[in-house]
Amino acid sequence: MSRRLISTAALLVLTAAPAHAEVKSATPGGFEVGGSVAINAPPARVWTALTAPDDWWSRDHRWFKGSTLSLDLAPGGCWCEQAQDGRVSRHLETALVEPGSKLVLRGGLGPLQGQGASGGLTFDLKAEGAGSVLTWSYIVGGYTPGGLEGWAAPVDNVLSAQLANLKTRVEAAD
């Protein structure tokens, strides 16, 4: 193989996106973002990690410095952030759990909490070969001054980054 071909192949491997994500639609009344990520681990291990968000959700995308995230999988359970000084935020609420395969959460992530908007965040997990594919979507509707379409790309970027963190965390457990 030529040195140039090897260099090109190495560059492609190093720059390959860990997840496929996109803004599927965006209007003043709402948006849909989503994608999928292939994870080199069995679904059971991915599920365990997915349901422990404190281990993979970036500390740069939390309300409170030094906070912890928890997820109660009971219906109506809280994806909550707790600061050491007692401050707490209920980011999402558990709507549906199919252990090992599907998780649906409802609510407004981040600054959407203070808007007249809410959404459904769905994770579908399937085995693929020796690994897994995690497909996700976040569908948001409601009202905010200036419309919701401008929120779609930033929300997609944040969620895509978090799921890349999840992939890295799960695959590093080998």
Annotate each language-model stretch with its function.
Residues 1-8:
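Bacterial N-terminal signal peptides that target proteins for export
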Residues 8-9, 19:
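Cleavable N-terminal signal peptides
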Residues 19-66:
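Hydrophobic ligand-binding cavity/cleft-lining segments
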Residues 35-37, 69, 90-96, 119-127:
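Hydrophobic/aromatic beta-strand elements that line small-molecule binding cavities or substrate pockets
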Residues 43, 50-52, 83-85, 96-98, ...:
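A mature extracytoplasmic/lumenal domain signature
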